Amino acid sequence: MSPIYINLMMAFIFSLLGTLLFRSHLMSTLLCLEGMMLSLFIMVTSSALNTQSMITYVIPITMLVFGACEAAIGLALLVMISNTYGTDYVQNLNLLQC
């Protein structure tokens, strides 16, 4: 396994740990999710370039679309929650009350 893949897996694991450890603020959770998506995108793109199959070129583009949708929805929720509650603390939110 090349050092690039090891570094990308470490970046994914550190982003996952950041998501688990720093889940008190919504903004830090969104940043960790973006780090996970970026490391997955780079891994999939580099593996698609190594296999040189036409079907594998579609997967990174699909991941970019899902990543952009995830970022847009996350930022919209962050703005809505910060305007409604005045903070981005996840503990203060009760999603069952809407």
Curated annotation (Swiss-Prot):
Indicate the family of this protein.
Belongs to the complex I subunit 4L family.
Q: Which Pfam families match?
A: Oxidored_q2
Quote the subcellular location field of this record: Mitochondrion inner membrane
> TM spans, by residue?
2-22, 26-46, 61-81
Note the superkingdom of the native organism. Eukaryota
Higher taxonomy: Eukaryota, Metazoa, Chordata, Craniata, Vertebrata
Q: What is its main location?
A: mitochondrion
Bilayer topology reads: Multi-pass membrane protein
- Which reaction(s) does the protein catalyse, per the Swiss-Prot or TrEMBL entry? a ubiquinone + NADH + 5 H(+)(in) = a ubiquinol + NAD(+) + 4 H(+)(out)
A GO-annotated cellular component: mitochondrial inner membrane
Q: Any signal peptide, and if so, which residues?
A: none
Summary of the function given for this chain in its UniProt record: Core subunit of the mitochondrial membrane respiratory chain NADH dehydrogenase (Complex I) which catalyzes electron transfer from NADH through the respiratory chain, using ubiquinone as an electron acceptor. Part of the enzyme membrane arm which is embedded in the lipid bilayer and involved in proton translocation.
Specify whether Lipid biosynthesis is a keyword of the entry.
no
Gene Ontology biological process: ATP synthesis coupled electron transport
**Keywords, comma-separated and alphabetical:** Electron transport, Membrane, Mitochondrion, Mitochondrion inner membrane, NAD, Respiratory chain, Translocase, Transmembrane, Transmembrane helix, Transport, Ubiquinone
Quaternary data: Core subunit of respiratory chain NADH dehydrogenase (Complex I) which is composed of 45 different subunits.
> One MF term from GO for this chain?
NADH dehydrogenase (ubiquinone) activity
The Enzyme Commission number assigned here is: 7.1.1.2
The identity of this protein, by name, is NADH-ubiquinone oxidoreductase chain 4L
Q: Which InterPro entries match?
A: NADH_UbQ_OxRdtase_chain4L/K, NUOK/Mnh_C1-like
Carries keyword Zinc?
no
> Source gene?
MT-ND4L
